[in-house]
Amino acid sequence: MVKKNIVVLTGSPRAGGNSDQMADALIRGAEQAGHLVTKISTAQLNVQGCVACMGCYSSADRPCCHNDDFNRIAPLIERADVVVFAAPLYWSTFPAAIKRVIDNFYCFYHGGRAVAGKRAVLLSCGEDTAYNMFDGIQRAYELILPVLGWSNAGMILAPGVNDPGDVQKTDALKRCEALGKTL
């Protein structure tokens, strides 16, 4: 098997929370399969939102005109074979911290960077018990992929998960670890 370079972007402001545990389970499986994994907590980053200035890669050493942490993580994302989005559901979509990072993916698109061919994974959890609560985040994820030329490698959604540790009462962690092994 070929070793994959995997970047896991977590979006929860709650370190060790349910979506973080989902990410960690996927990472465990991926590492057991021999893959190299880098976990990035977007809530700990200083990333400005895209302001549509069209200054993407106007400086060879900076993907974004903002002097922020996106410029540090962009090369990791560019080199990745797989990008994982792990986030709790906030108002039916991605939380602000990971959304700012995703918005800055425009740098890759506008800057003409060769990022096509990657695979992506969505891991998400939310308080409601109905699966349709994930419609917003799932649709956003599905719309991002073709723009970047990425394909879906899997999606694990865990409803009924809100309080710290609730995800441990579901089969989501087992499914995340199994998915990590298949990447």
What are these regions (language model features)?
Residues 1-86, 90-111, 157, 165-183:
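N-terminal beta1-alpha1-beta2 submodule of the flavodoxin-like/Rossmannoid cofactor-binding fold
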Residues 160:
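Active-site rim beta-loop-alpha module in soluble metabolic enzymes
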Residues 131-132, 163-165:
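Short active-site-adjacent structural elements
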Residues 96-97, 109-154:
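Short, glycine-/small-residue-rich phosphate/pyrophosphate-handling segment
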